[in-house]
């Protein structure tokens, strides 16, 4: 896994575990869940995405792409969430989060890769179906963000989201189709086993917990996947789900998302189920 040379050299002098993260960031949620499952003490550094704190020179000296999370372990910097949770499990062996069986280990690794690939679609769907009520940037603020942020891929995405009232149908259909395909594959795997990579909870489950939670907030029809729904029900029984994910949401935030989703559907007809493969009955 890639260890990053920090632009901020003072990070090399940091003792202990440090996490720069966003409350609602799904990638941050993965890392917090892993830290909680492994009962590790860590230092929290909140980066407010709505306030564009990820676009500051100070933060981009920590994370060169201006994304969250960033993680430091006694001076060692990592920036990809699946790399971070794998690092934590390999370097802090108490409460192992990897399967014992070699075949299951390969399954886990493949689903970590899939979770990473699914991130772009999760981002697009979240911004469309949950984050639209966020205050729009003024033209001056958007210009400043574009100038200050080093990550041009993110800048292009934010500009498109800020300027338009809805992403293109082509993009939304594609993101829905790919997400539905992943969920269907997970549902099929979970038909014959308790967890994604066997009979033990692993990093694969942690990597996908935030995604399913996020989709539940936007009223994604999870009842299309009976086994995945059963899995999510047992996930929610883990204290790490509550402590490291739900408790970081502001009071009433989940209810606010759900109310917005319902209101938008009534007023405009726009809802995630109006796109891609979700417009068709679930495959049996």
Task: Describe each PLM feature range.
Residues 1-152, 264, 271-284:
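GST-like domain detector, emphasizing the conserved glutathione-binding G-site
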Residues 15-18, 23, 167-171, 216-217, ...:
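A short, structure-level motif marking secondary-structure boundaries and short turns
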Residues 49-50, 201, 250-251:
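Positions that flank functional sites
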Residues 89, 211-212, 245:
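Active-site-flanking alpha-helical
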Residues 95-100, 121-122, 196-199, 242-246:
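Short, hydrophobic secondary-structure boundary micro-motifs
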Residues 120-237, 284:
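GST-like fold's C-terminal all-alpha helical module
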Residues 229-284:
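Long, positively charged, glycine-interspersed low-complexity recognition regions
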């Amino acid at each position: 896994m890639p260890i990053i040379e920090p632009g901020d050299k003072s990070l090399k002098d940091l003792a202990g575990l440090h996490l720069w993260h966003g409350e609602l960031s799904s990638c941050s949620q993965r890392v917090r869940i892993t830290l909680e499952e492994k009962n590790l003490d860590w230092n929290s550094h909140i980066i407010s995405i709505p306030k564009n704190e990820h676009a500051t020179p100070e933060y981009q000296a920590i994370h060169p792409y201006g994304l969250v999370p960033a993680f430091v372990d006694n001076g060692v910097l990592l920036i990809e969430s699946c790399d971070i949770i794998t690092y934590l499990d390999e370097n802090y062996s108490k409460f192992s989060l990897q399967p014992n069986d070699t075949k299951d280990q390969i399954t886990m690794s493949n689903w970590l890769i899939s979770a990473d690939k699914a991130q772009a679609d999760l981002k697009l769907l979240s911004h469309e179906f949950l984050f639209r009520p966020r205050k729009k940037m003024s033209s001056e603020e958007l210009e400043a963000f574009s100038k200050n942020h080093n990550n041009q891929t993110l800048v292009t995405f934010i500009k498109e989201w800020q300027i338009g009232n809805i992403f293109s149908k082509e993009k939304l259909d594609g993101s829905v189709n790919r997400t539905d395909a992943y969920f269907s594959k997970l549902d099929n795997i979970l038909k014959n086993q308790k967890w994604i990579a066997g009979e033990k909870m692993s990093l694969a489950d942690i990597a996908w917990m935030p995604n399913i939670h996020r989709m539940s907030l936007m009223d994604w029809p999870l009842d299309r996947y009976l086994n995945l729904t059963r899995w999510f029900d047992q996930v929610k029984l883990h204290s790490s789900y509550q402590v490291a994910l739900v408790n970081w949401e502001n009071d009433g935030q989940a209810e606010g998302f759900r109310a917005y989703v319902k209101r938008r559907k009534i007023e405009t007809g726009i809802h995630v189920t109006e796109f891609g493969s979700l417009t068709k009955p679930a495959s049996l």
